[in-house]
């Protein structure tokens, strides 16, 4: 493949961020088709070599988890089993391909072109979110958001209803605020793989996350930035040479936290308020998780989630919820202790990485690997190509930039 074609192929990645939630077509009631539905094919554009061994390992793990779920999970709605299983297998294929592929290298003189496209995407979505927020403040509603939602994979009617009752959330080109924030953080990590400082873009991305109203997004951005401060300045060499800069940057960070404290404290308080989104995402489902870990019939077969969740009668707003908005809890409900052990194993790897990152966290390596488990707390729609793209895109760029550590 020629260099020019290769450049165009990688420029698809920032473009996909704009279109990731735009529905092209629909198969049945629960299978929207988007550009990332074809992600396995798109990955072939970047393919230089593939490790069949790694791919087989990934597919084998996926097959084992699927078999466990089928054998031990209780079926409450057999009609949705095939579709739900296909989605899980599809995600395994995408992750397996990204892990096993050696991507074509992006040459240094093309970095700026790709970065410009990412900057353009950030500018467009944050500007749109700002316009949506302005309309919400001025009119109490958002006809812009309502118009855009007609072209998205899922309706954001619950967000519009929330706004009618005085809430302030934006979604830009995405189907919900949490996914919007997740997309911005994914873009941010993609940009960071190029190893340059982008304070203006960082500020714009933070502004977009705040406009989304996603508490998970705000806290994740704060966590990742605080980690980077620690990795840069909490080592002997940096303390000797950069102490004033470290203190200034920490002071700026603390000022930001103080300004955001009323919002943070309010959202933390919501964790104890039944019916709030924070309660429904974190606290309410714990009873389901506990049941899945302590009862033989606690594992739910693919496709039966709605009925299982509804049986616990946990309120999401004024209605009984039927979905799980927490990916980690979803994995436990489907795979029980396997999900717990795999999560602990992965976090052990990340913690070991953190210990060795002080003074040497090349291109936000720790934050990139931490992003996968943290992202589980943003959404329950983790068995979707759209979610998978947000997770794997920064890894694709890291491998294409030949960052080995």
From Swiss-Prot:
InterPro entries noted in UniProt: Colanic_acid_synth_WcaD
Spans through the membrane: 5-25, 27-47, 55-75, 81-101, 117-137, 171-191, 204-224, 244-264, 282-302, 327-347, 376-396
Predominant place of localization: membrane
BP-aspect Gene Ontology terms: colanic acid metabolic process; lipopolysaccharide biosynthetic process; slime layer polysaccharide biosynthetic process
Keyword match Iron-sulfur: no
Coiled-coil positions: none
Pathway(s) per entry: Slime biogenesis; slime polysaccharide biosynthesis
Alphabetical keyword list: Cell inner membrane, Cell membrane, Lipopolysaccharide biosynthesis, Membrane, Transmembrane, Transmembrane helix
Mode of membrane association: Multi-pass membrane protein
Protein location: Cell inner membrane
GO cellular component: plasma membrane
Protein name per UniProt: Putative colanic acid polymerase
């Amino acid at each position: 493949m020629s260099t020019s074609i290769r450049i165009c192929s990688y420029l698809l990645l920032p473009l996909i961020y704009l279109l990731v939630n735009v529905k092209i077509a629909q198969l049945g009631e629960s299978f929207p088709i988007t550009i990332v539905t074809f992600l396995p094919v798109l990955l072939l554009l970047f393919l230089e070599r593939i490790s069949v061994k790694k791919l087989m390992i990934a597919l084998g793990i996926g097959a084992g988890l699927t078999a466990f779920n089928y054998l031990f999970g209780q079926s409450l709605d057999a009609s949705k089993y095939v579709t739900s299983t296909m989605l899980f297998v599809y995600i395994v294929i995408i992750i397996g391909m990204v892990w096993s592929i050696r991507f074509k290298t992006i040459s240094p003189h093309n970095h700026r072109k790709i970065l410009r496209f990412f900057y353009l995407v950030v500018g467009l979505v944050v500007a749109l979110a700002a316009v949506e927020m302005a309309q919400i403040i001025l009119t109490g509603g958002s006809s812009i958001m309502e118009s855009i939602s007609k072209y998205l994979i899922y309706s954001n009617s619950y967000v519009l209803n929330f706004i009618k009752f005085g809430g302030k959330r934006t979604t830009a080109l995405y189907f919900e605020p949490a996914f919007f924030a997740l997309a911005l953080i994914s873009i941010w990590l993609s940009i960071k793989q190029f190893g340059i400082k982008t304070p203006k873009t960082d500020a714009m991305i933070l502004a977009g996350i705040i406009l989304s109203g996603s508490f998970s997004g705000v806290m994740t951005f704060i966590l990742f930035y605080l980690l980077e401060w620690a990795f840069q300045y909490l080592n002997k060499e940096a303390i000797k040479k950069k102490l004033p800069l470290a203190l200034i940057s920490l002071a700026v960070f603390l000022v930001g936290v103080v300004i955001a404290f009323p919002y943070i404290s309010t959202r933390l308080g919501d964790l104890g308020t039944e019916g709030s989104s924070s309660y429904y995402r974190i606290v309410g489902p714990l009873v389901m998780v506990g049941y899945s870990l302590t009862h033989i019939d606690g594992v739910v077969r693919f496709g039966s989630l709605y009925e299982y969740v509804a049986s616990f009668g946990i309120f999401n707003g004024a209605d009984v919820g039927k979905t799980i908005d927490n990916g980690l809890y979803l994995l436990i409900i489907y795979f029980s202790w396997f999900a717990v052990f795999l999560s602990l194993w992965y976090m052990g790897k990340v913690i070991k990485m953190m210990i060795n990152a002080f003074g040497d966290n090349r291109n936000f390596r720790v934050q990139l690997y931490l992003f996968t488990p943290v992202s589980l707390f943003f959404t329950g729609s983790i068995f979707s190509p759209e979610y998978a793209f947000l997770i794997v895109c920064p890894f694709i760029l890291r491998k294409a930039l030949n960052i080995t550590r």
